[in-house]
Each structure stands twice: as structure tokens, then as C-alpha cells.
Design a protein with these regions (language model features):
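Hydrophobic membrane-insertion alpha-helices, especially the h-region
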Residues: 5-23
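N-terminal Lys/Arg-rich, disordered targeting/topogenic segments
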Residues: 1-2
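Catalytic glycan-binding domains that act on GlcNAc-containing polysaccharides
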Residues: 20-189
Length: 189
């Protein structure tokens, strides 16, 4: 067989293998980063102006889409809301009176979790600050922003310098998941 034909055959095989590998990786990524509760996520991300990919990433990171998840500190549901945060949101911001057991309901949990992200965004220009506050608390983020060790401009955090390891890792993990969701579902090829 002539050398040129061998090169062409190897090139075609390499290209086919590349496409199959990429297809397989995307298939695995879609299994590990699913689109669940789409109706609720689209509804509340639009209503409260929070990027859909970010909401999916928070749910993936917080509960891996397990609506009955409960953390060791008592956070409940898909977006792992603390009962006290839920009560504060429902009574003081949305003038509703709901039982904390409603946090197990996917739509309820997504609605109030997305509202909470949106509310935190009113304090910060940066989604990383929002995520840090969602995980580590508003007061802590405000203190970090005032400290040059953690913020160079008083508006954004230096992620690798967030003093709480859990919060630092949380922000990184959500960002990674958000990038994956953007790539898989929300960007045009």
C-alpha cells in the first residue's frame, strides 16, 4: 500500500477517534451534570435575574440534585437553604408564611434559593462574592472585602485567599460546575 494512502487512513482514523472521544466525554459530562428541574430553574432564574448555569451549578454543588438532602448543619433541599434563612426570606422579604418542611419541595427550594442568590447580588457586583456569601455568610464577605489581604479593590475577592477553606473550595467548585453547564448546554458551538 502506498505511503500516502496509509497517512490518509491514519488521519481519518485519528479524526474519527477524536470525534468519538469528544462525544463520549460530553455524554459522561451530561450524565454527571444533568438538567433537572428545568421548568423551575428557568422560571426563577428569569424572574430573579440569576444565570441558569449558575443555578444548576449551585444545585449540583450543594445537593447533587437530591431534593431530600440535609447537611450536617441542617441545610435542607436542592439548594441547601438553612431553615432560618428560609424563614427570613419568606416572612421579611416575600411576606409569606411557609413551614420549613416546604424546603424539601423542589420548586419551593429553587424559588427561595434563587431569590436568595438574587438578593445577595444586590450587595455585590461580583458573582464570586455572592457565592462566598451564600456559603460563608454576608458579614464575613463584607469583612473580607475591607481587608487588602482578601480583596485588592474592595469589590471582588481573591478566591485563593478566601480565609474559610470550605468557602474558598465552594466558590471554586461552583465556578467549575458553572463552566461545565455553560459549555454543555448554554453556548453555541
Amino acid at each position: 500500500m502506498p505511503y500516502g494512502k496509509i497517512v490518509i487512513i491514519l488521519l481519518v482514523i485519528s479524526i474519527a477517534f477524536g470525534f468519538l472521544f469528544d462525544w463520549g466525554c460530553n455524554l459522561i459530562d451530561k450524565k454527571t451534570h444533568p438538567l433537572r428541574y428545568t421548568e423551575f430553574i428557568e422560571k426563577y432564574s428569569e424572574k430573579y435575574k440569576v444565570p441558569k448555569a449558575l443555578v444548576y451549578a449551585v444545585i449540583k454543588t450543594e445537593s447533587d440534585f437530591e431534593s431530600n438532602a440535609v447537611s450536617p448543619v441542617g441545610a435542607i433541599g436542592l439548594m441547601q437553604l438553612m431553615p432560618s434563612t428560609f424563614e427570613d426570606i419568606t416572612k421579611n422579604f416575600l411576606s409569606e408564611n411557609l413551614e420549613t418542611g416546604m424546603l424539601y419541595d423542589p420548586e419551593t427550594n429553587i424559588k427561595y434559593g434563587v431569590f436568595y442568590l438574587s438578593w445577595l447580588k444586590t450587595f455585590y457586583d461580583d458573582w464570586n462574592c455572592v457565592l462566598a456569601a451564600y456559603n460563608g455568610g454576608l458579614g464575613n464577605v463584607n469583612n473580607w472585602l475591607k481587608d487588602e489581604e482578601y480583596s485588592e479593590d474592595g469589590k471582588t475577592l481573591i478566591i485563593d485567599k478566601i480565609p474559610f477553606k470550605e468557602t474558598r473550595n465552594y466558590v471554586k467548585k461552583v465556578n467549575k460546575a458553572e463552566e461545565k453547564y455553560e459549555k454543555l448546554y448554554f453556548t453555541e458551538d
